[in-house]
């Protein structure tokens, strides 16, 4: 547990025995096989959460590592459930990580319990022109704790369809804005469900911000695509 991320573990097969007898062996890779040490950033039970899933990782212009993920408080199941978007921040290349932040959490919005205001499957993007960091996720309001994939319907308002929301940080991931709902800008009203592609987005050379998306169209068929902004996310 105390190993450094810079450490490596090397292994080499010297002999192989079958029925306690040394077998003929052809060495494919004569050099030692080296693996880096993996360090768990989040573990079941941390911060009172049953599970952490759907990670994404980005590096800011200052070299800060920002890792996002679902904070699944009650179990590891998908939305709809009590789920927030968590973020871990490291300024030393991943050796140590600061206390978890919550860029997106909806609590008891609209008078419904947190388990019917889940937000998750995040994607993160660093605008390399400004060092503004964006996190996008799907917010599901209501749905009676049914799986969001089948409980989001055509329309635009939060009582009928999942909402696409953003949060941004302009101080290298230390603090985060209130949720920014962009559903009206990017969703076709005929689609059943629109959400981001979990993981990370990119900044193109001309400054265009690009996030992967997925959506269920009017035929109930899942599709993949992108959404983009040419005005710094405005």
Residue spans for each PLM region:
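Generic N-terminal initiation segments characterized by hydrophobic and/or small/turn-forming residues
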Residues: 2-3, 183
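Short glycine/proline/serine/threonine-rich loop/turn segments at secondary-structure transition edges
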Residues: 3-11
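Accessible peptide chain termini
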Residues: 1-2, 234
